[in-house]
Amino acid sequence: MEEELKCPVCGSLFREPIILPCSHNVCLPCARTIAVQTPDGEQHLPPPLLLSRGAAAAATPPDQDAAAGATSGGAGANTAGGLGGGATGGGDHADKLSLYSETDSGYGSYTPSLKSPNGVRVLPMVPAPPGSSAAAARGAACSSLCSSSSSITCPQCHRSASLDHRGLRGFQRNRLLEGIVQRYQQGRGVVPGAAAAPAVAICQLCDRTPPEPAATLCEQCDVLYCATCQLKCHPSRGPFAKHRLVQPPPPPTPPEATPAVTGTSTASSAGGCRSPGGAGASAPRKFPTCPEHEMENYSMYCVSCRSPVCYMCLEEGRHSKHEVKPLGATWKQHKAQLSQALNGVSDKAKEAKEFLVQLKNILQQIQENGLDYEACLVAQCDALVDALTRQKAKLLTKVTKEREHKLKMVWDQINHCTLKLRQSTGLMEYCLEVIKEDDPSGFLQISDALIKRVQTSQEQWVKGALEPKVSAEFDLTLDSEPLLQAIHQLDFVQMKLPPVPLLQLEKCCTRNNSVTLAWRTPPFTHSPAEGYILELDDGDGGQFREVYVGKETLCTIDGLHFNSTYNARVKAFNSSGVGPYSKTVVLQTSDVAWFTFDPNSGHRDIILSNDNQTATCSSYDDRVVLGTAAFSKGVHYWELHVDRYDNHPDPAFGVARASVVKDMMLGKDDKAWAMYVDNNRSWFMHCNSHTNRTEGGVCKGATVGVLLDLNKHTLTFFINGQQQGPTAFSHVDGVFMPALSLNRNVQVTLHTGLEVPTNLGRPKLSGN
């Protein structure tokens, strides 16, 4: 709170604060210091005025703008006499500044200067000319100032306000702030060795040491006078005739826990002003009076001027035509508004405290994370150094092995060549000795064998025998440039794991036995995703498996089980790794199967119409067409209506694998399980094996039903609602697709999406 109690000009606690038109506060002595003359009057301002105003700012007691002795501090008594018995002294004339404003609003603008504190122009202390007295200087200043105009600039918002004929007395005194400052000073405790508060109130204008006890208190000036100073500084005539002089109040006894504060005395002596009752003591609270009608108390509040007024101001003053409200009601209303505003500020202050706690936690986390990252960096670099050391050892081992291998090869070749050379040299020397002999018969006895030996020895020195088997150069080249580049490029990657993808439920849907999922990356993410991984369970609550990996954010999965519940989830990945999973979405496939004939898998002679629900053939041979659905679990039922039946053909109905042979009747290979039927009877067929002939055939308008129960692994056929023979096939397992074979004499229409009928008839007995 102390910052709120300091003057923006002097930086000390407020002394006699006044309220400027902009609602900011400033000390009265400081206000005298920063009050400046307008350009019109400033050029005629004599230098002695500056000295007079500087002295007044340093030593003027409270509310003594009209007192002649109040302009010179402790020497006020003598100065008042020097100025004569005028209505006001030099200080009063200094405060009576004429009107000046840049606009009619009473406010002006001012650009702060680097040479002025707080953007306020402070008048320098210019010495008086030689040979002139202070009284003469003040007199000259007063006479000059009466004909000049002045203004004051707020040190906080830098708005200028012109002063009327009352000068600074025209600004209201902030007694509330003054009382808060006094209580704050008293509550700060006593400095050891401080003097105790005086037992009686003392005069605030005495230049004697010690000051005389106060005899009177002026309610309008709020100043304590002794008898002598009252006669000199506050005579009961002129402008002081209407002032009310009362007995000074007794000084309050300070509590033992919080005695008088030395700081208050220091501030008072430094500023040249003391509170009534002496240092460290505050006068009892009294109601402020109107500055224009000094005998009247405030009773109303002017809404237009936003200031309290008395009833005289309403009757004859400038507030007579203004909107006014009762002072007490307005006081309570403004208190309520202030309390409400304080609640908002309190909430913001609470948020700010929590935010500061959060910032301090962030500081601690930064310290901890910094240490962790440093340790991690050291560990990673040490691991790289260790890996490089191990690789260095491996490479050195390879070089050593290569060197030893080359040395061994060379030594082996040296030994072999040395042996051959010794043998050849010995043979050569022996042959030379034989040639030297002169015995022909002896020579011829061994010449043939010797010639063969020499030839054999010569053949041993084949081509390449005198060439080194290995080179002195090593065929090992270490390319360290990529590793050096990688080391130079080793740096921190400003990327983290991607965030959790958000599933867009409004775009997720199921259709038949396929599901479509959509997702997106959260907004304002700083870790973009390079791709996504979509996982789906098996429809029975089993483990998840990846069904899609890519950059798209929309995926459709076909070929799922009907009447099944699937759980799906997605996660993102980037170069830093794989992010967390999204929330799991539950998808329910269709209860019954909806499908048509598949034009892509059917034989080219098959003719489809009616949105691929009606099939016929252009050939007299049987051709196969499959459905678009595939079943591996559940119970499924569909019907085929015979639209045309000519010349007693044998259409076949059933199920098949996707790889079934399509240019012959259904059931002749091991990829199909079927019932073929004519107009009189039917047979079951698989792997070209005909079984269970049953009476009863089909004709135009007949309906053939197929029931595939993969829970019981059975296949059953029906004609016109009656089961045709026993259960056709058992132990069927795997993935099956609806299938049909027919020729040009038959046309059938497929009906799907049917519930399993509960009123199917009993089976017909088979003929065989």
Swiss-Prot record:
Descriptive protein name: Tripartite motif-containing protein 67
Query: Coiled-coil intervals in this record?
Result: 332-369
| Residue span of region Disordered | 55-74, 247-284
Q: Does the keyword Transit peptide apply?
A: no
Q: Where are the zinc fingers (RING-type)?
A: 7-42
Gene that encodes it:
Trim67
Q: For the COS domain, which residue ranges apply?
A: 435-493
Main localization (coarse): cytoplasm
Q: Show the ranges annotated as biased composition (Low complexity).
A: 55-70
Q: Which UniProt keywords apply?
A: Coiled coil, Cytoplasm, Cytoskeleton, Metal-binding, Repeat, Zinc, Zinc-finger
